[in-house]
Amino acid sequence: MNEHTVKAFDEDIGELRGLIAQMGGLAEAAIDASMDALKRHDLEAAARIIDGDKQIDELETEVERLAVRLIALRAPMADDLREVVAALKIAGVVERIGDYAKNIAKRVAAIDGHSVIEPLSLLPAMANMATDMVRNVLDAFAARDPEAAVRVCEQDRAVDDFYNSIFRTLVTFMVENPKSISQAAHMLFIAKNLERVGDHATNVAEMVYYAATGDHMGDRDQGDTVPLAGS
Amino acid sequence: MNEHTVKAFDEDIGELRGLIAQMGGLAEAAIDASMDALKRHDLEAAARIIDGDKQIDELETEVERLAVRLIALRAPMADDLREVVAALKIAGVVERIGDYAKNIAKRVAAIDGHSVIEPLSLLPAMANMATDMVRNVLDAFAARDPEAAVRVCEQDRAVDDFYNSIFRTLVTFMVENPKSISQAAHMLFIAKNLERVGDHATNVAEMVYYAATGDHMGDRDQGDTVPLAGS
């Protein structure tokens, strides 16, 4: 590559990083806003979150277009190619995090805070832990910091523990409040969505680690957290 | 492109299609097997499904490697590039469908068929509808058939209706059987996983349509199905 090509590549990859940071900021804000709408049973705010998800989707399309153009025109090799592919995949994951915020917003109408006060108070704390992971992992991506990525993976254990505790709390709540079972079931899905946000942040952390080092972080346990039977 | 390049591209894209067909077959079989393990409370079969998911993940990595090589070396334009990007994204979605089978398998231990016979009988029928969509959409991809892709999207409505009906059945069951609430909650997640399989097949259908025609199928309602409050 000549100097001009290198500079053009750096500009493109900088643009990719900027788009992903923008997506991440929107996804994080959408999750915070969904918790707020839930607490206040604010249907208008929920509708805005659902509608706002389109913006994240559009940014993902822009990332794809740019990444494909970059691969096709600049034919990056090794490290650079690994970084473009990581950006493409990270954008896909952040888009899914945005979808979780949208899904939570869709449940606002189904949950009336007054009748399910107790378990409702646990969700925002869990949401904070999950969005914290998203923020940290995107910072790690921007800084190409593999150590920060490892720390994000460690945070995921706390989110999983929190999820298991909410699952048990909600099942107990259902047993004691059969009239609120439908609402509690919706809250169970919200807790699961937040747990998945943590999983996705972990996935991104692994991609950041791989893009920065060329090595895999090792076979960590991924995927759905299933509390033990009878819990 | 000269004749040699065209032929090499066709071979590569054929290999991509073959890998995706293989992934789809494995994902479909994993969902069927998870229903079977659930009905028979077969923990060994469940463990095999969980372990087998790695194979689908490895195939996705192979698709990525091949697609990136194809874009970088052959620099495909317009229609061809659209098809490679579609293949890349479709592989990602099929990998997620495999994850749902794994997640269902993880819940086998938490569900004892004897105490939840009634709602348990509904899940395999829903699973059949969802895997039918997966099979049809991968056939549509192999045949580059946009009309078949549209039909897959239409099938998704039936899966969503089924999900809403299972949600109501399970909530009623929980009210009447407070001791089985934890198990019923796991079944709710299984039903939700199957509903998401249908959504993902719909996403793939839209990619197949776009890859084949260059047009978007139109703004269909996507994402999480949330039954109405009080249902």
Predicted regions and their residues:
Chain A
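Cytosolic, long alpha-helical scaffolding segments
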Residues: 1-231
